[in-house]
Amino acid sequence: MTLKNLTDDVLIERLKKLVHEEREILMSVLHHLREVERRRLFSKYQCASLFAYAVTELKYSESQADRRISAMRLL
C-alpha cells in the first residue's frame, strides 16, 4: 500500500506515531553520544573528537553532527 492510498486520518495517525518514535530514538542517540564522549571511545577509532567520530564513523554530515552534539550537551 502506498501513502497515496491511505485515508487522511490514517496518514495523520501514522505520521504522529512516526514522529513520536523519532523523538524517542533521537533521545537514545543523544544519550549514547554522551556516554561515548564520557568514555572517550572516539579515540579508539583514531578520532580526535566526538565530532570527528560522528562525521567519519557515524556518517553524519558536519551540520548533523554539530546539531546532535550541541543537543547532547544540553542533556
Task: Give, region by region, the residue ranges found by the protein language model.
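Amphipathic alpha-helical "recognition" segments
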Residues: 47-75
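N-terminal acidic-hydrophobic amphipathic loop/helix motif that frequently occurs adjacent to catalytic
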Residues: 1-58
